[in-house]
Structures are given as C-alpha cells and as structure tokens.
Amino acid sequence: MNFSIKATIRAWSAPEHKLACRKQLWRKIVAELERRGKRRHEAGTFLLGIERNGRKEVQSAVYYDDLDPSAYDSGVCILHGDAFAKLWSHCREKGLTVVADVHTHPGAGFQSDSDRTNPMVARQGHIAIILPNFARWPIRQGNLGIYEYCGQHEWLERSPAHAPNFFYTGFWS
C-alpha cells in the first residue's frame, strides 16, 4: 500500500483548498514583496508550482522586476512582452508552471478595474492574489483579495469571505 501521511492529513485539515503554499515560503514571498515595493509602490511575483489532483501547489516565486527591471517604474506593476518569454523559459527549465500571481496594493486587497481587465495570465483557472498595504506584515488571511480567472475578463472572487478554504498556507501544504 502506498500512501502519504502528509497528504492524508492535508486532505482532512484543508479538504476544499485549490491553492496551497507552505507557511514559511508564503511568509518569505510576502516579506520580499514588501521589500521590493519599499512600502511606496506596487510589487508582484508569479507563483510557480505544480498542479496535482485539481490543486495547485506553490514551490517557488519569480518576481516581476527580475523578469523586467522596469516593472515598477510607473508605481504599478507593468510587464512588457519579453518578460513573459523569460518567465516561460524559466518554467520550462524548472519543470514548473505558473499557478498564481501576487501583487500588492496601497490600501485594501481588492481587484482594481485595471487588474480585472489586464490579467497577468489570461488563462482560465489562473489565480490572482492581491495583498493589502503594500504587503506590510502582519496580513490577516481575511484581508487578501483572491480571484480566479474565467476568461473574457470575467473573474470569480475566491477571497476568504467568499471561499474560506480556497487558499491554504498551513503546515500541511
């Protein structure tokens, strides 16, 4: 018999989650976004990982300004076309896929009109997470803006108030 104790406990403790990130990795990503944004402008990253049994598991991150050094020049996150070529090349090298993107906002973690009409990855099922207050820690899970792309500039809100178990950052990720 082949089974994983971790997978069994995770299925019991967070049965409905669709996106998971280890707690230590999530904290590191948030801290790095705060550092890169300098508490003055937006910063962002692509979360890379794998999809398994309908769940996306974050394993690493690639920050927007590593792909495009001018990504934050306007104060908001803007990536130019060649940044995506670098991203897809990196994914191929690592055998990973983009499972979500995360970026910061100055106030609340909500999806702006610009976010809604310009998805970073315009693929059905893509997840966008918005961190409030330029990622200043601590950030309560309930303050995250989480959205799942449906195509045609339509999104489903997956924020904790609407889908409390969608994003899991606990020990069993």
UniProtKB/Swiss-Prot annotation:
Its EC number is 3.4.19.-. Zn(2+) binds at residues 103, 105, 115. Its cofactor is Zn(2+). Keywords: Antiviral defense, Hydrolase, Metal-binding, Metalloprotease, Protease, Ubl conjugation pathway, Zinc. Coiled coil: none annotated. GO terms for molecular function: metal ion binding; metallopeptidase activity; ubiquitin-like protein peptidase activity. InterPro entries: JAB_dom_prok. GO terms for biological process: defense response to virus; protein modification by small protein conjugation; proteolysis. Belongs to the M67B family. Component of the Bil (bacterial ISG15-like) antiviral defense system, composed of BilA, BilB, BilC and BilD. The Bil system specifically conjugates a ubiquitin-like moiety (bilA) to the bacteriophage central tail fiber (CTF, or tip attachment protein J) via reactions involving E1 (bilD) and E2 (bilB). Modifies CTF of phage SECphi27 and SECphi4, which probably interferes with assembly of the phage tail. Also modifies T5 baseplate hub protein pb3 (gene D16), but not gp27 of phage T6 (Bil defends against T6). BilC is a probable metalloprotease that may cleave non-specifically conjugated targets. This is Bacterial deubiquitinase-like protein BilC. The gene is bilC.
